[in-house]
């Protein structure tokens, strides 16, 4: 799978993935962790922007459909390739992407009278669980298909840590979980 961008001659994802696979194989590594902001390649952000199209072919045709098909092909091939060398895969579902940066959220949740963060305001600014799940629905659907078929393919769902009571929290009174809207 390759990102569709102008600098693929310098930053070739396909070559990097192959090089990493050979490294794992050579070093006889038994567990590999797959971590990314997956929707960056399948859906973009909540508004559909910030989308990095990918392709499974050597073409530059950009579309959401092509990127999603390529993601599925890449996931399937990755699982098969690592299974063939007896490597257990751990797929981390992406952390909930927030609507606002951590800085903005804390500035707008700060109670000047009490000189502290108002947790209720912070919770209200945090992304809704359903909105988060809707954005991730395509990736989760594809991942679950393989999870149910392959015993060497495991998933770790970070929503269990970040989400509660219909919200995926950006942080608490003492600290933010995020550096911005989508990086921990």
Which residue ranges define each predicted feature?
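Extracellular glycan-modifying ectodomains
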Residues: 1-184
